[in-house]
Amino acid sequence: MRSFNLNIAGYKIRIESSEGGPELVPAERFLRNICNESDHDVLIRVHAGKFTIPGNAEKVFNAPYIEEINGIQVKKSDRFWSIHKYQNDLFIKTLFPLSLKSKKAILKYSLNSSEWDLWIEGGGAEVDPLEYPLDGLILYYLTVIHGDIMIHASGINSAGNGYLFSGVSGKGKTTMAKLWDNSGARVIHDDRLIIRHTGSGGYVMHNTPVYRNDVPLQSPLSKIFLIEHGKKNELIPVNGSGCVSMVMANCIQHNWNTEIIAGLLGSVSIMCPVIPAFRLLFKPDKSVIDLILKNE
């Protein structure tokens, strides 16, 4: 196809192939986010071939390629993606480590513009313009622009109550999602969520397409649990600056720009007094669900 529109976490994304550009073939995980809406928050034009970042652009961030093997993070390469700044423009330069083709891409974007450009080199006649890691990077910078929060967390909805379970890798996000799923709750996602303010004082958590069979899901956010494995189940209320710092520690953030960091800090600081938060030490069985529901 030459163009398509997506709605992911309420962000309206239009992707168009430029004149002479490649055919656009989004991966299966995005198909259920395709929509017919004509307006958009951001337009991304896709070009084939090489693009050269201005020579005097400053590299402001570099991300190595890290794989998780048996719960341990292992650096596989120093080269993955990087961010470069030239005047008011930003550039993401990336490789595609999961691709069968040896290709690379550059995304030109601005936090003050709704029109971005993407050049894919070595992709052939057909490309997925949202191939990993571009999907997460595009969504992250949309959260920055809109003052939202992207966080490492699983989320569920039980009887209308939305619970978010946040923690770094290995703390039990997926385990918690499975426990609730087995208890009949709706799992919003087990790994990554976007939290958006509703404009009327509340918050909604959204999933994003990560797995092949993902469908768009959202839930009002009722409580936040900062999780870790324990010998017994224990709920400890957290608030104030302690709550803000614990939530911030699990947020996805690029720390190269003080304004971006300040914006995220502001968003989390506004949310924490509104949404009750707890440290949750838990045993990986149904008893933790009983504890949470008992304290509802």
What label would you give each PLM region?
Residues 171-173:
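Conserved glycine(s) of the Walker
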